[in-house]
Amino acid sequence: MSLLREHLVAVSQSKTKLPGKPSESTVRRWAKRGVRGKKSGDVHKLEIRYIGSTMYTSIEAFERWSERLTEEFL
């Protein structure tokens, strides 16, 4: 699925647009370093795209990422 066809959110606006109101630095960390899953040990990174110098994710990408993490920690 192409991130560009989804509801884009500038990472700088994540506090007002994403569930849980994560800070910009937290979203950047999730995108760059990811979160290691408890069951598999895999690192799950939040999908991002740069448009110019602005980093974007999407509501749908956040949902997919959080679903993967939920499975890892249940």
Language model features: what each stretch is:
Residues 12-16:
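The alpha-helix within a helix-turn-helix
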Residues 1-7:
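A detector for short, charged/polar N-terminal pre-domain segments
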Residues 8-10, 55-56:
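Ordered hydrophobic segments in well-structured contexts
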Residues 53-74:
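A short, Lys/Arg-enriched interface patch at domain edges and termini
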Residues 17-56:
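Major-groove DNA-recognition helix of helix-turn-helix-type DNA-binding domains
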